[in-house]
Regions:
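Helix-terminus/linker motif at the lipid-water interface of multi-pass membrane proteins
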Residues: 31, 35-53, 123-130, 186-193, ...
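Hydrophobic transmembrane alpha-helices of multi-pass small-molecule transporters
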Residues: 65, 180-185, 210-214, 286-289, ...
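Membrane-helix interface/capping residues of multi-pass secondary transporters
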Residues: 41, 50-53, 90, 119, ...
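Short alpha-helical transmembrane segments in multi-pass integral membrane proteins
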Residues: 1-23, 81-148, 190-246, 302-367, ...
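Transmembrane helical elements of multi-pass membrane transporters/channels
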Residues: 21-40, 142, 153, 176, ...
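Small-residue-rich hydrophobic transmembrane alpha-helices
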Residues: 53-113, 150-169, 263, 276-340, ...
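Short runs within selected transmembrane alpha-helices of multi-pass transporters and secretion channels
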Residues: 74, 142-161, 169-177, 198-213, ...
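N-terminal transmembrane alpha-helices
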Residues: 10-47, 61-76, 80, 84, ...
Length: 445
C-alpha cells in the first residue's frame, strides 16, 4: 500500500510536491553523509594534532573508493529499477535489486582483501610522510575491514528511492552516520584512541547502516527483493546496471583518485598544506553534497516519467529542479564564503594550515554556485538511460579535464595552481553536460 502511494506521487502529484518529496529526504541524507565526513576530521582536530588531521585527509579519498564502487550498483540499480517500475516490470525490478545486493557482498570482500594486502604500497602512493604514515596506516587498516557493509549502505541508500521510499533511504544513512558522530568523541577523546577511534566509529556506523537496509527487505516492507533466488545476471540485469552505474561511479572513483593525486602533489609543500587542502574540500562539500542529494532525489521521478513516456511531466519536473538547484547552490555558496574562516578554524589550529585552508576554500567556492545545475543534469542523463553521455560528463569533471589542469596549473602557479584546477574543470564540465543533454534531447524527440 505504501509503495502504491509512492508510485502515485511519481505519476500524479503536483510537480513541486513530487520533486520536493523525493529530493528533500535525499538532500537530508547527503547532509548526514556530510556530517559523517566532517565528524572524523572535526573530533581529531580537537586533539590539536594537525598531523592526524593531515593523515585523515590522506586516507579519506582511499576509503571513499569503497563508496564509489557502491554507487556502481546504487545509481545503476536505481536507474534500471525506476524505469522498470514505470513500465510495470516488477519481477525484473526484483532481479535487479537482488543482483545489486550480492554484487556488493562479493566485490566488497574482494576490495577489503586487496586493500589489506597492499596497504604499504597504497600509503606510499598517496604521499604519506614519515610523520603521517603510522596514523594513516592505522585508519585505513581498520576501515578497510568494513568493505561489504560500506558498499551495501551506499548502494541501497539509492536503490530504495527507486520505489519512492526516500524517507526509508534517508533513515538508513541517518542511523549509520548519526551513530558514527556519537561514537567519534567517545572513542577519540574520552577513550583516547585518537585516529583509531575515528576508524572504529566509521566501521560501526557502516555496519549499522547496511543492517538497516537488509532488515528493511527481510521484513517484506519492499516490493523489491534481495533474495538469492531472485539473483540473475541475464536479461540485461547486470549489463543494464553496469552501463549506467559505471559512468556514475567513474565520476566518484575519479573524485577519489584525483583527491589522492592532489594530496600527493600537495605533499611537496608540506603536511600543513595537505591538512589545509583537506579542510578546504570539506568546506565546498557543504554545497556539493546537498546538490548531489538533490540530483539523486529527483532521478527516480525523472526515470519513472521516462519509463511511462510522460514527457510533459518530465520537462516540468526537470525545469523546477534546475531552478531550485541553482537557487539552493547560490545560497549555500554565499554562506560558506562568508564563514570560511570560522569553519576552517574548527578543524585546524596551526597558523600555516589555517591560512592554506582559507585561501584554498575561497578558490574552490568560486564555482560551487554551479553544482546544483550540474548534478541535476547528470542525473537527468542517467534517468534517460544515456550511458555514454553520462560517462563522458562524469570522467571529464574529475579526470579528463581536472587531472591535466592540475598538472599544468600546478607547474605554473605551484600550490595555488593545483587548487585552481577544480574551478576550471567545474566550468568546462558544466558546459559539456549542457551540450550533451541538449543533443540527447534532440535525438529522443
Amino acid at each position: 500500500m505504501e509503495n502504491n502511494k509512492s508510485m502515485e506521487v511519481f505519476a500524479k502529484a503536483p510537480i513541486r510536491k513530487a520533486v520536493l518529496q523525493n529530493a528533500l529526504p535525499a538532500m537530508a541524507a547527503m547532509l548526514m553523509v556530510l556530517i559523517y565526513n566532517l565528524a572524523d576530521t572535526f573530533f581529531i582536530g580537537q586533539t590539536h594534532d594537525d598531523l592526524q588531521v593531515a593523515a585523515v585527509s590522506l586516507a579519506t579519498p582511499v576509503f571513499l573508493l569503497f563508496m564509489s564502487v557502491g554507487t556502481v550498483f546504487g545509481i545503476g540499480g536505481t536507474s534500471v529499477i525506476s524505469r522498470a517500475l514505470g513500465e510495470g516490470r516488477k519481477n525484473y525490478a526484483k532481479k535487479v535489486c537482488s543482483f545489486c545486493m550480492w554484487s556488493c557482498v562479493a566485490v566488497g570482500v574482494l576490495m577489503s582483501a586487496l586493500f589489506l594486502i597492499f596497504m604499504d604500497q597504497i600509503l606510499a602512493l598517496i604521499g604519506a610522510s614519515a610523520e603521517t604514515w603510522d596514523y594513516a596506516r592505522t585508519y585505513l587498516t581498520i576501515v578497510s575491514c568494513s568493505g561489504p557493509f560500506v558498499l551495501i549502505a551506499n548502494c541501497y541508500s539509492n536503490v530504495i528511492r527507486a520505489e519512492g521510499q526516500s524517507g526509508k533511504a534517508m533513515m538508513g544513512q541517518l542511523l549509520g552516520n548519526l551513530l558514527n558522530v556519537i561514537l567519534d568523541p567517545i572513542m577519540i577523546l574520552v577513550f583516547g584512541w585518537n585516529i583509531a577511534g575515528a576508524a572504529i566509529a566509521t566501521v560501526i556506523g557502516n555496519v549499522v547502516g547496511a543492517g538497516y537496509y537488509i532488515i528493511y527487505f527481510l521484513k517484506g516492507s519492499s516490493s523489491l527483493s534481495i533474495s538469492l533466488k531472485d539473483f540473475s545476471v541475464k536479461e540485461k540485469v547486470a549489463s543494464g546496471v553496469l552501463a549506467i552505474g559505471i559512468p556514475a561511479a567513474l565520476g566518484n572513483l575519479l573524485m577519489s583518485l584525483s583527491s589522492i593525486l592532489m594530496n600527493s602533489q600537495m605533499a611537496k609543500y608540506g603536511d600543513m598544506a595537505v591538512a589545509g587542502v583537506g579542510v578546504a574540500m570539506k568546506v565546498t562539500m557543504m554545497t556539493s553534497m546537498v546538490c548531489i542529494g538533490l540530483g539523486q532525489g529527483v532521478q527516480p521521478l525523472l526515470g519513472y516519467c521516462v519509463g511511462a513516456k510522460n514527457w510533459e511531466r518530465y520537462r516540468s519536473s526537470l525545469k523546477f529542479s534546475l531552478i531550485f538547484a541553482f537557487l539552493l547552490s547560490a545560497v549555500l555558496t554565499l554562506i560558506c564564503y562568508l564563514f570560511t574562516g570560522q569553519i576552517v578554524s574548527v578543524f585546524l589550529t596551526d597558523a600555516a594550515a589555517y591560512d592554506y585552508g582559507v585561501s584554498f576554500a575561497h578558490i574552490l567556492l568560486c564555482t560551487s554556485i554551479l553544482f546544483g545545475v550540474f548534478y541535476v543534469l547528470v542525473n537527468a542523463l542517467q534517468a534517460r538511460g544515456a550511458a555514454t553521455e553520462s560517462l563522458i560528463v562524469n570522467i571529464s569533471r574529475q579526470g579528463l579535464i581536472y587531472i591535466p589542469a592540475m598538472f599544468i596549473l600546478g607547474a605554473i602557479f605551484h600550490e595555488t595552481g593545483l587548487i585552481w584546477a577544480q574551478p576550471v574543470a567545474d566550468v568546462l564540465s558544466l558546459l559539456l553536460a549542457i551540450v550533451l543533454y541538449v543533443r540527447k534531447t534532440k535525438k529522443m524527440l
